[in-house]
Amino acid sequence: MEARIDEGGEAQQFYGSVGKRSVEWDLNDWKWDGDLFLATQTTRGRQFFPLGNSSNSSSSCSDEGNDKKRRAVAIQGDTNGALTLNLNGESDGLFPAKKTKSGAVCQVENCEADLSKVKDYHRRHKVCEMHSKATSATVGGILQRFCQQCSRFHLLQEFDEGKRSCRRRLAGHNKRRRKTNPEPGANGNPSDDHSSNYLLITLLKILSNMHNHTGDQDLMSHLLKSLVSHAGEQLGKNLVELLLQGGGSQGSLNIGNSALLGIEQAPQEELKQFSARQDGTATENRSEKQVKMNDFDLNDIYIDSDDTDVERSPPPTNPATSSLDYPSWIHQSSPPQTSRNSDSASDQSPSSSSEDAQMRTGRIVFKLFGKEPNEFPIVLRGQILDWLSHSPTDMESYIRPGCIVLTIYLRQAETAWEELSDDLGFSLGKLLDLSDDPLWTTGWIYVRVQNQLAFVYNGQVVVDTSLSLKSRDYSHIISVKPLAIAATEKAQFTVKGMNLRQRGTRLLCSVEGKYLIQETTHDSTTREDDDFKDNSEIVECVNFSCDMPILSGRGFMEIEDQGLSSSFFPFLVVEDDDVCSEIRILETTLEFTGTDSAKQAMDFIHEIGWLLHRSKLGESDPNPGVFPLIRFQWLIEFSMDREWCAVIRKLLNMFFDGAVGEFSSSSNATLSELCLLHRAVRKNSKPMVEMLLRYIPKQQRNSLFRPDAAGPAGLTPLHIAAGKDGSEDVLDALTEDPAMVGIEAWKTCRDSTGFTPEDYARLRGHFSYIHLIQRKINKKSTTEDHVVVNIPVSFSDREQKEPKSGPMASALEITQIPCKLCDHKLVYGTTRRSVAYRPAMLSMVAIAAVCVCVALLFKSCPEVLYVFQPFRWELLDYGTS
């Protein structure tokens, strides 16, 4: 949570000479409409004003200095409950006057060693030097040992005898050492890509700290000249001239050496060598990456200059970065865009719908240096749409401090994404030509689209390059669990990814235009083997919790690595627990990245996310048009294939709420054309059939789906079930509909050829179906002959209250309302009712006749003439002979 200045707080120092504000803007002070791209300042008890002649085009932008200022002060009496970005990783609402390191103690029980004067490494990991090398220590009531590679405590069983690192990290370290060196890139020198990205990190760092010092523009010139040397010598010359010409402008560079180096002074000659030796080569000899302590901060960036860990920093990969005067963040590798969820969770997964052009959801990131939300023009959304030629079908935005980081999620055609990223510099030129707003034409702007990035200075594109490093060198998200959460519960997230704990990594959680406060949990990070990636990579898991402020919508989990690499992953917020449980089935599928099933699953999450977002906006949705019916149909088909009853019900509810297509009186007919009940019968899904038969839309009285609804060729669901094998359960459900039209339609409903469902069953030899329906018909007719009599519960009380006018009744009299039809049956139906007893009488007569015959046979003396003597029953013997 970001702290703010209290009115009674200590006066701050202003850099009036360079026109900077005292503190960075606070996310709590602004209400951002992510759909209209409008920033509205909230009513606060404290307002910020610049000193003197401070300019609106430049403000404090330090990710380090201002972060310390935010942590050094606190606002009192703030009970508005606004959601803010937890930049410093604290979950408490108030902070001490200044965050110092004097209070750090060893985490080992009964140690309490003061870590204020020890090395930064021991301070960050909260372990004293003695226990970091001890063979055992008690932490959390468990005997453990500190791992030198993981920089955290493990159980003793995870260590081999005499080893200071756990077996898992040693195994990964040995595998990396045995791997052969990668083949050179297309330019013949793979270290050039590393050097370019180090320069980009340095440039971003300078721009974020340009308020700290004044003078000296040579540093920026050297960096940019070296950065664009790969693109051409002439571009570098033009860039330096551009920077020199802008020296007296409002957005001129005021940069000091310490802004780059993170120390008090640094030799300028080192920078010249850094620029001159860009073409040099060096063998790659990288050590194990540095990792943080087990309770690492989800939102903080550990790149403070005083926290630089020289002894654990990896050796440089290029002689140009070999000086130890540079902080460790200069030597770190920056990630490429190789994963389908880096910059876009579906960058490699086009939509599976049958639209004319394949669509994809991605994002564009703008970092506007020296700007504040009040400088956003009212027509910002229109400017973005004009720049993109109105190609996005859906668009949503977020802002957060760090000057201003404007993140735009949008859905547009794959060809539009390719056109935008293939020549980002030309595309940005169109944006700058279309608008003369100071937001775009003054100061520095950093733009990121997929693996392309660009820098804009005073309305001109000065850098346009791409990132291309191995995936093991950057952070990205593999999966987020749960994929769908109920709005009524506290969200407990588990984020799985690569290099989540490396230096300079931030994990952000955003929902419907807002960033949420993340509460860290102790021992939340674990490492496990990755079964679907290269064995040299290690999968890390981060657990944290946060409160969901909405009932329904879509959110994103974002990871950011020093401004160069970024990755995001969508998740859903739904009020129905059954919907959440069904969508969570996709969690396992999404972990197998690169497969067709994973691509389709990610498309589904994006599409239903946009639908939930539009359904939440309602009539205030600024996106052009309505949610197309063809996209809705693809969502229905995807859910129907997986037999998700709750998801289908949710989609139908949103359809009748008007979130899909042009809702009118013909919407029922439009939905009937999808033949959902026919699809469910073909899937042989009895739960889906039962749900559809009992689904009644809002503000309607009758069921929408009927078992006698005619589809293609006049086929009804009954026809389909009668012709399929093993459809007893589905047929049973179809004939148990609320209106009981299924039984009637079994023998009366005909297709285009004149056959009934019963005829289909006879032709296919499904006589069990016929017997099943016949039993139901017989049961129905028998039930209709019975008369239900309502007998009072307390009849004795009624007798006591009523006076007895005559002798005590010997029988219960049931009064019945006169009915002509009943009287008619009583008069003319006596003979027919007596026939019901005729079979019993005949049976009794037959039994009596048999008994008489047997008796006569026993008492008579039958004679068999000419063969035997007269036969008598009394003379009959028994035995074997």
Swiss-Prot record:
Residues 49-69, 170-193, 274-358 are annotated as: Disordered. A motif (Bipartite nuclear localization signal) lies at residues 163-179. Changing R152Q: No effect on DNA binding efficiency. Residues 170-179 have a biased composition (Basic residues). This is Squamosa promoter-binding-like protein 1. It comes from the Eukaryota. Zn(2+) 1 binds at C106, C111, C128, H131. A zinc finger (SBP-type) spans 103-180. Residues 53-62, 339-356 have a biased composition (Low complexity). Trans-acting factor that binds specifically to the consensus nucleotide sequence 5'-TNCGTACAA-3' of AP1 promoter. Binds specifically to the 5'-GTAC-3' core sequence. One of its GO terms (molecular function) is zinc ion binding. The SBP-type zinc finger is required for the binding to DNA. GO terms for biological process: regulation of DNA-templated transcription. Residues 275-284, 319-338 have a biased composition (Polar residues). It comes from Arabidopsis thaliana (Mouse-ear cress). It is found in: Nucleus. Residues 96-187 are annotated as: Sufficient and necessary for DNA binding.
